Amino acid sequence: RPPRSTPKPSSAASDVYKRQDKNKEEHYNLISALHKSLRGSDVDAALYWLARMLIGGEDPNYISRRLLRFASEDIGMADPNAVTHAISCWDGYKRIGSPEGDLFLAQSVIYLATAPKSNAAYKALSNAVSVAKQN
């Protein structure tokens, strides 16, 4: 089944589309697409965007940091084990490296995409900080 949120590039733009540009807009577009796919629980699309980032040469540690943040910010207390899982997968990647370690990133993406979502902790901290700044 094709990913629900995967755009189709034109053939003329395929080389540009496949290339990762870490210092420009495409870098942020890809991580944003991965996040949106995770939030939407779209496993296929999330794996697609992960693959695009890996093929494009994105730093796997950057990807892992973003997955860890997602586990805390977007899943949080709905599944507290998501943070532990993201850390374990990041550690596995660091121990094995690419290409075999890419499977750890895929495992993390699948877990996070299928986990229940809650940003209650994020909202609670944001509210507490806002109140603390007023006092």
Label each region the model flagged.
Residues 19-50:
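Conserved helicase/translocase motor-coupling segment
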Residues 1-13, 17:
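Single conserved hydrophobic/aromatic residue that forms the stacking wall/gate
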Residues 9, 26-30, 45-46, 63-64, ...:
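N-terminal alpha-helical segment
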Residues 11-15, 27, 130-135:
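Non-catalytic accessory segments flanking P-loop/AAA+ NTPase cores
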